[in-house]
């Protein structure tokens, strides 16, 4: 491949280089056709001359186009100007390759460049190995490839097609260390991303501000100031780390300036909170069912016609979005606080019922022409819009009745619950209400396993069930009661004749969970004093024969709920006969002996005394139709074994209702607390007990008690 291509002197092309303005216009020779005889004699007509003239003009235009194409190729082949090299043999251009618009040149362009670069590397390696090798200095000679146009193209093709078929798309000058591309590399499928070596350039941003038009000024927002110390003004540390003494006036002034600057930089939205009330005020002018003048203009309707969406609503129904706004949803949470009331209690299945949605009928929207009658003077054009006439089921009052009947309000539901509780004789709710009306003080102390007979009573008197396996060994005779005694039930009357208000307050309506350690200790001392006084008063009394106590039984709690009702002799004898096979022998001996000085007799006497006091007001004791009495006293048999009626079973009895669920429902997955570190915990409580006395909660209690 030759180093240069020689086309001759440039002056040869100058006669063809005329500017467009200086191009002479063809002047047509006008021939006068006055005499037809002269035309025939000369043998040359006007038609032939005009045809020759047209051909000459086409030839001139074609030569000018070829001249411009040759000039462009000559500019491509000329040596680049402005490049100065020290050694033209090594530093000058190695070769120049012209890439034509051919599929082969586009496909193998990268391989051609790699071949040239490999040649340069091979030459450099040879120079390193043999420096003294003679180099060939050839004279410049014309290129072996002649840039000629393909003359096989038909002459009928236009000049424009020839240009497109033989246009140069790339011209690369290869030097030793670099290459110079004058026209650009060819693109693969005209896509620079698919062509190797092509990268989309990334330009640096020169203008950081908006360029304004002539005569206009653009207000540029102030930049947010950098945080700095409000005390000394340094940006290296914050105010909390400032070593300088604090200047309150300067700090306040700088903080205010910083906040103002931040507010201006953020368009007065710096550290502003989002409130729902602002949204309501913002869209407060929009009301459902009310069409404003702007909306009428936007819809293209007047106040003398119904909006088109009204006719569509007749087919789709009431908008579900506004129906959602009218929902009143109950949380379904039930509060078990142990208090006797119907406000925070729920029955079985009541939570699922409360989850049903209710609606506030006052929030139903009025839509004239949909759920209320169309105003007078406004026509109903439902046929034009392809809709349906007003439906009676979509009227507001009919829709409200539908919501009321299918989605009951909370008040109606609670009323139904009360009526159902009163109508069912064996429901737990009815039993609870009866116990509340009777004012039973020990209703909360009943065991959850204790049951009462159902409405269907049997003619037989109650019988004791066989004793359960003992949890703890029975206490021997003469053993004093244990140190820990349960607190008195809620509402238990005082056990001593003393009428002091302190005693009534301690044993009154104070919840045992809210008592402090000192109050519990004081209550324990009062219980012991009451037991000692009962022992001294009833030291000469004998225990009745039919007292339901075993020889080593200990009362777990006082039994104020048992009715002291007279029992016929026949019933008594029958009861004794039924009790003999099942009651242990020690029970008969102990009941006949009647030891008055033992703790069993003391507790029995105390239970009898309280029975006599509470008999007029207690209706909880289950008096059967045949006159037998079902005791409500929680009595232990053999230490911790309860005695229950014989005919008590799940099929014939209902469990006594308690507002607090059974502990077994809360004990799943709970690890029992082992009292290993109780000494440290108790000591810590005793240390901070003085601080707890002055707590706001205790101060409120003392204030209420004093009032």
Curated annotation (Swiss-Prot):
Residues 659-707 are annotated as: MTREX binding. Disulfide bonds: none annotated. Changing residue 676 to A: Does not affect RNA helicase activity of NEXT complex. Residues 466-496 have a biased composition (Pro residues). Changing residue 299 to E: Impaired interaction with ZCCHC8. Induction: Slight accumulation in cells entering S phase of the cell cycle. It comes from the Eukaryota. GO terms for cellular component: catalytic step 2 spliceosome; nuclear body; nucleoplasm; nucleus; TRAMP complex. Residues 286-299, 309-324 are annotated as: RBM7 binding. The modification N-acetylalanine is found at residue 2. PROSITE patterns: ZF_CCHC (PS50158). Keywords: Acetylation, Coiled coil, Disease variant, Isopeptide bond, Metal-binding, mRNA processing, mRNA splicing, Nucleus, Phosphoprotein, Spliceosome, Ubl conjugation, Zinc, Zinc-finger. One of its GO terms (molecular function) is zinc ion binding. Changing residue 662 to A: Does not alter RNA helicase activity of NEXT complex. Changing residue 674 to A: Does not affect RNA helicase activity of NEXT complex. Residues 45-80, 516-539 form a coiled coil. Pfam families: PSP, zf-CCHC. There is a cross-link at residue 413 (Glycyl lysine isopeptide (Lys-Gly) (interchain with G-Cter in SUMO2)). Changing residue 692 to E: Loss of RNA helicase activity of NEXT complex. Residues 456-465 have a biased composition (Low complexity). Residues 34-43 have a biased composition (Acidic residues). Scaffolding subunit of the trimeric nuclear exosome targeting (NEXT) complex that is involved in the surveillance and turnover of aberrant transcripts and non-coding RNAs. NEXT functions as an RNA exosome cofactor that directs a subset of non-coding short-lived RNAs for exosomal degradation. May be involved in pre-mRNA splicing. It is required for 3'-end maturation of telomerase RNA component (TERC), TERC 3'-end targeting to the nuclear RNA exosome, and for telomerase function. Belongs to the ZCCHC8 family. This is Zinc finger CCHC domain-containing protein 8.
């Amino acid at each position: 491949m030759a180093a240069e291509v020689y086309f001759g002197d440039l002056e040869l092309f100058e006669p063809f280089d005329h500017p467009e303005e200086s191009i002479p216009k063809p002047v047509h020779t006008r021939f006068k056709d006055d005499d037809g005889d002269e035309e025939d004699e000369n043998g040359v007509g006007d038609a032939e001359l005009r045809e020759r003239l047209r051909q000459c003009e086409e030839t001139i235009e074609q030569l000018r186009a070829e001249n411009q194409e040759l000039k462009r190729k000559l500019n491509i082949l000329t040596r680049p100007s402005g490049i100065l090299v020290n050694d033209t043999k090594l530093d000058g251009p190695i070769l120049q390759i012209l890439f034509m618009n051919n599929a082969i040149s586009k496909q193998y362009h990268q391989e051609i460049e790699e071949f040239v670069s490999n040649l340069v590397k091979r030459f450099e390696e040879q120079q390193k190995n043999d420096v003294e090798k003679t180099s060939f200095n050839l004279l410049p000679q014309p290129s072996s490839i002649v840039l000629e146009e393909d003359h096989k193209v038909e002459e009928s093709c236009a000049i424009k097609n020839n240009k497109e078929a033989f246009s140069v798309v790339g011209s690369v000058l290869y030097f030793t260390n670099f290459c110079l591309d004058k026209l650009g590399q060819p693109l693969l499928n005209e896509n620079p991303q698919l062509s190797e070596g092509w990268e989309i350039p990334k330009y640096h941003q020169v203008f950081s501000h908006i360029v304004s038009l002539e005569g206009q000024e653009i207000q540029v927002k102030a930049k947010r100031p950098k945080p700095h110390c409000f005390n000394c003004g340094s940006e290296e540390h914050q105010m909390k780390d400032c070593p300088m003494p604090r200047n309150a006036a300067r700090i306040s002034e700088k903080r205010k300036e910083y906040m103002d600057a931040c507010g201006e930089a953020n368009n007065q939205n710096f550290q502003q909170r989002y409130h729902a009330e602002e949204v309501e005020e913002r869209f407060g002018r929009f009301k459902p069912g009310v069409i404003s003048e702007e909306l009428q203009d936007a819809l293209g309707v007047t106040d003398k016609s119904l909006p088109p969406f009204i006719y569509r609503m007749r087919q789709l129904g009431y908008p579900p979005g506004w129906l959602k706004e009218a929902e009143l949803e109950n949380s379904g949470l039930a509060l078990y606080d142990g208090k006797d009331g119907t406000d925070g209690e729920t029955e079985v299945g009541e939570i699922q019922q409360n989850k049903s949605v209710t609606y506030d009928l006052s929030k139903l929207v009025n839509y004239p022409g949909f759920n209320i009658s169309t105003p007078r003077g406004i026509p109903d054009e439902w046929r034009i819009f392809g809709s349906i006439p007003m439906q009676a089921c979509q009227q507001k009052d009919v829709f409200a009745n539908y919501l009321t009947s299918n989605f009951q309000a909370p008040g109606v539901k609670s009323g139904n619950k009360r009526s159902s509780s009163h109508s069912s004789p064996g429901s737990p709710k009815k039993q609870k209400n009866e116990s509340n009306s009777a004012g039973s003080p020990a209703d909360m102390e009943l065991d959850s396993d204790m049951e009462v007979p159902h409405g269907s009573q049997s003619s037989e008197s109650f019988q004791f069930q066989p004793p359960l396996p003992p949890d703890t060994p029975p206490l021997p005779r003469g053993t004093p009661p244990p140190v820990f005694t349960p607190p008195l039930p809620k509402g238990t009357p005082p056990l001593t004749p003393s009428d002091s208000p302190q005693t009534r307050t301690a044993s009154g309506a104070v919840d045992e969970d809210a008592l402090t350690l000192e109050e519990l200790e004081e209550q324990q001392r009062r219980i012991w004093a009451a037991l000692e006084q009962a022992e001294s008063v009833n030291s000469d009394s004998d225990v009745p024969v039919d007292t339901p106590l075993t020889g080593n039984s200990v009362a777990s709690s006082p039994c104020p709920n048992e009715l002291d009702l007279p029992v016929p002799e026949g019933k008594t004898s029958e009861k004794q006969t039924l009790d003999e096979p099942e009651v242990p022998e020690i029970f008969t001996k102990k009941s006949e002996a009647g030891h008055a000085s033992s703790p069993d007799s003391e507790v029995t006497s105390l239970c009898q005394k309280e029975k006599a006091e509470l008999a007029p007001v207690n209706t909880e004791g289950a008096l059967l139709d045949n006159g037998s009495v079902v005791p409500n006293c929680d009595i232990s048999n053999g230490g911790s074994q309860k005695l229950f009626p014989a005919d008590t079973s799940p099929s014939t009895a209902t469990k006594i209702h308690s507002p607090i669920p059974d502990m077994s429902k809360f004990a799943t997955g709970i690890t029992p607390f082992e009292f290993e570190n109780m000494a440290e915990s108790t000591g810590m409580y005793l240390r901070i007990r003085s601080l707890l006395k002055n707590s706001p909660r205790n101060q409120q209690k003392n204030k209420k008690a004093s009032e």
